[in-house]
């Protein structure tokens, strides 16, 4: 089996994009996606994204397999890459797409500057929506106590259609991400596991973040994580509603509008196109 693909990245968060418009099911199995994502024996990527035919009021459907074969609901950097990929496939005929994801309908728009702005929809804050068994004040978990790795942490939980646990630190560079990240991801208070963001507030309009992604580990960027980070920073009084979130791969501009929707603006870059032989 020969797989035709294009590789894109959003701030170093890299993906294999597959034109899957002829079928409503991904061309690869989760096991094959693991093979493709392997950085030694495959192409190498944080995940494989499939552009499937639209349904209902969507132009396309987005499916993703992480590098471990798991399937997340959505990916912010990935959907920017998908928008650029779709624009290439249709010859630039569209600049705005309505894409159905496991987190709902997401609308990316290609800007004249080459960046992609995405209406990420609203954040969800109720514990059952994360989901988490943590209890908080009212209908949200803000600065809750959680012991991870034999030390206490203050955590805020946010769902962008996928689960996020945000904790604020003095020095984000000093966080032992490879050690503590898996402990957060698999903590029993998160029945569907979680993405975890470690955040340093430089200014109310400038946040530095590192992320441990559920199913992918440490990555250079996470779009939904940047959105969840801004929400947590606003809820805890640390940030304005519009801020730059600096990730290891570069900055994203995030805005939490008064109507509740979050908008993310950032790059998506094509690296190359190619083919790979896979066992049938």
From Swiss-Prot:
Gene Ontology BP annotations: lysine biosynthetic process via diaminopimelate
EC id: 5.1.1.7
Site (Could be important to modulate the pK values of the two catalytic cysteine residues): 164, 213
Pfam family, one: DAP_epimerase
Protein location: Cytoplasm
Matches recorded under InterPro entries: DAP_epimerase_AS (IPR018510), DAP_epimerase_DapF (IPR001653)
Pathway: Amino-acid biosynthesis; L-lysine biosynthesis via DAP pathway; DL-2,6-diaminopimelate from LL-2,6-diaminopimelate: step 1/1
Active site positions: 75, 222
Enzyme class, spelled out: isomerase
Stated family: Belongs to the diaminopimelate epimerase family.
Protein name: Diaminopimelate epimerase
Lineage: Bacteria, Bacillati, Cyanobacteriota, Cyanophyceae, Synechococcales
Gene name of this polypeptide: dapF
């Amino acid at each position: 089996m020969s797989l035709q693909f294009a590789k894109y990245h959003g701030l170093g968060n890299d993906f294999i994009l597959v034109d899957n418009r002829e079928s409503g099911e991904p061309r690869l199995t989760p096991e094959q996606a693991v093979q493709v994502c392997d950085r030694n024996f495959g192409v190498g990527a944080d995940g494989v994204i499939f552009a499937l035919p639209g349904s209902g009021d969507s132009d396309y459907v987005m499916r993703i397999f992480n590098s471990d074969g798991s399937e997340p609901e959505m990916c912010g950097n990935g959907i920017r890459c998908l928008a650029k990929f779709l624009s290439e496939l249709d010859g630039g005929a569209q600049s705005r797409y309505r894409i159905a994801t496991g987190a709902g309908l997401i609308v990316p728009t290609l800007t004249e500057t080459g960046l992609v702005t995405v209406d990420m929809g609203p954040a969800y804050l109720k514990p059952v929506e994360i989901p988490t068994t943590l209890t908080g004040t009212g209908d949200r978990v803000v600065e809750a106590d959680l012991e991870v790795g034999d030390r206490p942490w203050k955590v805020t939980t946010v769902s962008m259609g996928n689960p996020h646990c945000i904790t604020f630190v003095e020095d984000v560079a000093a966080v032992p991400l490879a050690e503590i990240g898996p402990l957060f991801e698999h903590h029993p208070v998160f029945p569907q596991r979680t993405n975890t963001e470690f955040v340093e507030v430089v200014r109310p309009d400038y946040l530095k973040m590192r992320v441990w992604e559920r199913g992918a580990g440490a990555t250079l960027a996470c779009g939904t994580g940047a959105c969840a980070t801004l929400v947590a920073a606003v809820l805890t009084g640390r940030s304005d509603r519009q801020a730059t979130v600096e990730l290891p791969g570069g900055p994203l501009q995030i805005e939490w509008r008064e109507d509740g929707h979050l908008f993310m603006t950032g790059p998506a870059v094509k690296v190359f196109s190619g083919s790979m032989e896979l066992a049938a």
